[in-house]
Amino acid sequence: MKLLAFVFVFLASVYSSFAQSRPAVLMPGLGQHHHTISTKNPEAQRFFDQGLTLVFGFNHEEAERSFRRAAELDPHSAMAFWGIALALGPCINNVDLDPPHEKAAYEAEQKALSLAPDATERERAYIQALAKRYSPNANVDLRKLDADYANAMQGLFKSYPDDLDAATLYAESLMDLHPWKQWTLDGRPTEGTEEIIAVLESVLRRDPNHLGANHYYIHATESSPHPQWALASAKRLETLAPGAGHLVHMPAHTYMRVGDYAAAARSNALAADADRAYFRESNTSGSMYDMMYYCHNLHFLAASYSMAGDFAHAKQAADEVAAHAAPMLHDMPMAETYVPYPIFVLVRFHRWDDVLMLPAPKPGMAMTDAFWHFARGSAFAAKGQIAHAEAERQILATARKETPADVEFSFYFNKAQRLLDLAENILDARIAAAKGDHTQAISYWEKAVDVQDKLYYGEPPEWFYPVRESLGAALLLNGQADRAEVVFRADLEQYPRNPRSLFGLLKSLEAQNKTANVEEIRREFEVAWRNADVPLELSDP
């Protein structure tokens, strides 16, 4: 986590400077969420409500701005300062606070504590719980503070079982203990996950439109064997807060997992539009929200279009995210994660001539350079230029060996070496196939699938396409239709309605003269591929 932690330290350093660089304004399109606080100033109440809404939407810097405005309007409001401290705190996308950030949150919380005697009993409980999360000690164990806060929030939740915000924040505190790891790779809930789901479901039964509960419920279920549980939440978030780009985007996490790639693309496109409008009004381009969440929308958009077979739109989104992220690399090295996506889209659609016309990446982007060589090797193999492919493969192998074992190239904690290992196995498979050694090619495809299966969950997935598509195609082309059928069915378990695997399954059944359900599968494929702008064939895994 070394590189990831460095990135978040940088992000935290710019986070407060953006939050305090301009006064907050009341923003349109954020829904109607309300949490009554002790204040006689109606505008302070409105800014507090906006701040809490923005926390629920992971726009923490704008939330901090709103809470600070509430504190300016009512300097005696303990909950306004509680809100500042909450907004400065961690979430599943940023659990490692730097010491200055921790200090600022601690100071805001101390101010809230000093005003707490004039607050209500329930407000004091909120403030006292959050006090467990921060410390003046720069060398404090942040994970222990997170656990102490979660325990305190459990107490608040039990003391006020009808307080839906307390329940929602309690569930989030549990999620922060295992960020992006609510489920094991084999689909078992990790510690606390069942409690998270039970608490959020209890909130949604009483208030189906609760912004935070809908948001967190999608995150709590998306990597589970049951992502469809959150379909109702996804549908609600499409319209509950149209001005909150990240909340507009969130349905895509569920839609992608249930195989509705067109809906996932639509959610991300609408979210990107909402964020552009926000940047125009707020002048916050270059903020943490811009760097992380807007780029995430575009990245996810490219991935959604790619799954649906829409090359033109996938390439457009990939080019946009790479161009947007590139200027950030000096200050945010992890933004390089987005830069190779135009390369990946070309490989995904087998645009080999276009791959070979790509210029070399600029110096300083080691992973992008490695993936550029991977793409070139794949293109040369597809064209039968084996010597050139093997030369590119050697460069890729050297890059993997020279990459430190602890370096991550991921927002989801995956190691760079593992991603390069996956690329190397895929390239080996393509070179073996180009040589006519299909048995060896299948072996490499199987190794690649095994590596991909061990990647931590991320959405969109950390590797740009499901490698079982290629393994299934290789088996089918090698006359092993029965094994291909098994592989395509396994892929459809992980990527429901994946049109390429539906097509492969259809062809493998036809090759075995199996007629049961063939027409149903054909219709399902035609629906899934309806927005594609390219023909589909199995001749080039």
Question: Model-found features: residue ranges?
Answer:
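Alpha-solenoid helical repeat scaffolds
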Residues: 48, 82-83, 168, 215-216, ...
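Amphipathic alpha-helical repeat scaffolds of TPR domains
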Residues: 42-50, 77-91, 118-138, 162-183, ...
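Solenoid-like repeat scaffolds
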Residues: 72, 157-159, 204-206, 236-243, ...
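Residue at a conserved register position within TPR or TPR-like alpha-solenoid repeats
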Residues: 54, 88, 132, 174, ...
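TPR/TPR-like (Sel1-like) alpha-helical repeat modules
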Residues: 78, 85, 89, 99-117, ...
